[in-house]
């Protein structure tokens, strides 16, 4: 038996002209329709799930009436397996369904025949490709056959193609809106009927996809486990976690963003004295500079050349206790108690050691020619001369012991003094400014030959003159001899020996800087500062020698 094709739209339009089928041949036609559906719908064989194809019940031949008489005629459409339903079959309870999935509608009757020829003449490979494409398309869309009723025909003529197309679309939209469930029909595969829901194919496809996804997910899980094991091995290999070795930014100590100090080249370091380019004077030095300046400016200009600025070492004595003062200070300062006095004197062993130290210092190679050393042995006689019209004068006559000549005859006037207390050192300091005025020629020394002196001092002195610092170091051993009064029966008192260390500033250099202070104050400040620096060196050296001798305990 020749296989029949599927019902086309042309057959539906011309269903009135189709001849009726014989009742005896209904079963045969039914099998031909199923075979034709399998031939035209290969997706039912290739698809993993069942393809639903509705079988059409036997249809009686339509009866057409005309005005001349009730005559009926039957005729089979060429190459059709099922005839179109009449108007009477539209109201049946179980109408047959028409398959449109694999049927291409042609609106031109002339083009349909060549298309049939192409389908018949197509190669087996093309048919196979089309079958595979149709099967995959059906799987993806998960399409189900929809029951569709053939459009009603009119008695006068055929239904236009456009109206039939609109009717089909309207039926489909209504079914989608109303949620009509499509029936599942059995399909013959290899001579066996298998009825499975259309959802099974979708679940099978999802299972296949889930298998591939599960494989990829298993691989990613294994990779993540390997990464975690690697991180754990790295953490176990180190003694501490990384966050302790490299603390986070919020746990680090603050560091200034300016890195100017890091840019300093320590190999060739040149520091400025300060941001202004000079060293500011400390308070003590500034106080002494101001004090000297105020004293000099108070002296008459013609007498300034006889000024003597001396620094001596001793202990500041409290008159109430006859002991060294002990103010509540911890560093060197200016002591302003006017009742306190200081007697210039140092310990004999300290004096000898310091004299040896200065001598060795002057004999160093780098100091050769910088020191001028002068030894002298003189006798000083002091006189207090009092007149009715003038204030008392203190005269001092200096005579060379070795030659007996008068070396100096002067009037000494004390102008001012300042006491510097040094709690960390063994000795304090006194800076005094005095005038050593020469006695006029009309008042010769012989005039005071019969006068009784107020003091007699034998001085054995060694002077170290350092011109580069404008300082003279006098290391003097003084023997104070008592003065005998007219009572000859009294015993001569014992002499008192003191050891004095003095520093004297170069007066011409000081006065020169003082005169130019308005134009250049740096020279004056430098001379006074250098004088104080030398005094600090001497004071600290005396303290260190005293510590070495007495093991840190001061001899008071």
Curated annotation (Swiss-Prot):
Annotated keywords: Hydrolase, mRNA capping, mRNA processing, Nucleus
A Gene Ontology cellular-component term: mRNA capping enzyme complex
Listed Polar residues bias regions: 63-74
Superkingdom of the source species: Eukaryota
Cofactor requirement: Mg(2+)
Biased composition (Acidic residues): 85-96
GO molecular function: mRNA 5'-triphosphate monophosphatase activity; polynucleotide 5'-phosphatase activity
Record's subcellular location: Nucleus
Region of interest: Disordered: 1-28, 56-217
Oligomer and partners: Heterodimer. The mRNA-capping enzyme is composed of two separate chains alpha and beta, respectively a mRNA guanylyltransferase and an mRNA 5'-triphosphate monophosphatase.
Family from the record: Belongs to the fungal TPase family.
Protein name as catalogued: mRNA-capping enzyme subunit beta
Organism: Kluyveromyces lactis (strain ATCC 8585 / CBS 2359 / DSM 70799 / NBRC 1267 / NRRL Y-1140 / WM37)
Source taxonomy: Eukaryota, Fungi, Dikarya, Ascomycota, Saccharomycotina
